[in-house]
From Swiss-Prot:
Protein's name in the database: Protein THEM6
Record's keyword annotation contains Membrane: no
UniProt record similarity statement: Belongs to the THEM6 family.
Annotated GO CC locations: extracellular region
Secretion signal, residue range per the UniProt entry: 1-24
Length: 202
């Protein structure tokens, strides 16, 4: 029996990213026991620490881990403000359409950090979120990420009005976010032209 259990565990851990799903389940359960956040524009903070399985060859948190941590933080953010439930009620779904991360200073093994997530703006198709890794030792912003969360079969404004039961004013789009949105649009147009999609839609 023990041999079967060990063999099954080895097969499971060898073929699936088990820790990812366990972490996701833990985040979901924790959100169930935390009080909901009514302010959809409020910044949410989750706390983390660089552990052994986060390391790269230089004993820093590896680049991929930043994106993984952002995934879980966005999930917690959307769950606690009720964004996902509102989207589901309206039969809409949300998917990540683009991310850009800028690394400013590495996070070392054992270093604690805060991951701060907030909605910075939205348009007719997408939410735009900013996520910051802030070192607990000195408050330095070690990395900052912008994320475009596309809404399918719905719109951000409709979701927010359904959630808040009132009109929610969209914050002004900052200059750096405008540049980033233009970059995404230009990249999309270039890729469509490269694949011949523009010709097919004319």
């Amino acid at each position: 029996m023990l041999l079967w259990f060990l063999s099954g565990s080895l097969l499971l851990f060898g073929t699936f990213d088990v820790w990812y799903f366990l972490r996701g389940l833990w985040v979901a359960l924790r959100c169930c026991f935390q009080s909901p956040i009514r302010d959809v524009l409020a910044e949410q903070v989750v706390h983390g620490r660089v552990l052994l399985h986060d390391m790269d060859f230089m004993c820093h948190m590896n680049n991929a881990r930043y994106l993984r941590e952002c995934d879980f933080a966005r999930f917690a953010h959307g769950t606690r403000i009720g964004l996902f439930m509102a989207a589901r009620a309206l039969k809409a779904t949300m998917v990540v359409g683009a991310t850009t991360i800028r690394y400013r200073r590495s996070l070392a093994l054992g270093e604690g950090f805060e991951l701060r997530t907030r909605i910075v703006s939205w348009d007719e198709k997408s939410f735009y979120l900013e996520q910051r890794f802030v070192s607990k030792s000195d408050g330095f912003i070690s990395a900052v990420m912008l994320c475009r969360q596309n809404v399918i079969r719905g719109s951000p404004q409709n979701i927010l009005e359904f959630l808040c039961k009132r009109k929610v004013d969209c914050p002004d789009i900052s200059e750096d976010l405008q540049h980033w949105i233009r970059f995404i649009s230009a990249s999309s147009q270039a890729l469509r032209a490269e694949s011949g999609l523009d010709d097919k839609t004319k």
